[in-house]
């Protein structure tokens, strides 16, 4: 019960920071940081799994689908995965995170992207009008 409650609280917190195009930023609460696919993929996977397992309200699937749409903007027609943040440890200054390089086709980003894509294969669909109305309530 504690784990599920914590999961729900984290999902509630994360969705507030999802960008208009579905992606999350390298620094979640800093819109001037770059949009990053690895974290987005992890959040899409977790939210979709949460809905499918009944841990999150079904309307949360809208957030996952919007994230997936955003992810597709960072995957080239050739299948290259872009906007992967270089490995990052805990650093003392925000400037370090702003200046992290973005990689292409790095396994640290490709793995979460593949997991998110597979999780979304059988994810529930949503009625867009209803979901858009509910999304504000979720946020």
What residues fall within each predicted segment?
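Oxyanion-binding "anion nests"
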Residues: 1-27
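Anionic-ligand binding region
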Residues: 21, 31, 39
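A short beta-alpha structural unit
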Residues: 28-34
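CBM-like carbohydrate-recognition segments
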Residues: 35, 41-139
């Amino acid at each position: 019960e504690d784990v599920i409650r914590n999961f729900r609280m984290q999902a509630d917190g994360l969705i507030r920071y999802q960008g208009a195009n579905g992606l999350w930023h390298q620094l979640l609460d800093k819109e001037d940081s770059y949009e990053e696919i690895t974290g987005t993929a992890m959040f899409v996977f977790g939210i979709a799994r949460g809905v499918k397992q009944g841990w999150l309200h079904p309307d949360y699937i809208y957030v996952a689908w919007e994230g997936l749409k955003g992810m597709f903007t960072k995957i080239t027609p050739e299948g290259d995965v872009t906007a992967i943040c270089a490995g990052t440890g805990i650093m003392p200054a925000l400037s370090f995170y702003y200046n992290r390089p973005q990689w292409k086709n790095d396994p640290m980003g490709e793995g979460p992207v593949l997991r998110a894509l597979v999780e979304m294969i059988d994810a529930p669909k949503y009625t867009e009008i209803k979901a858009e109305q509910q999304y504000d309530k979720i946020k």
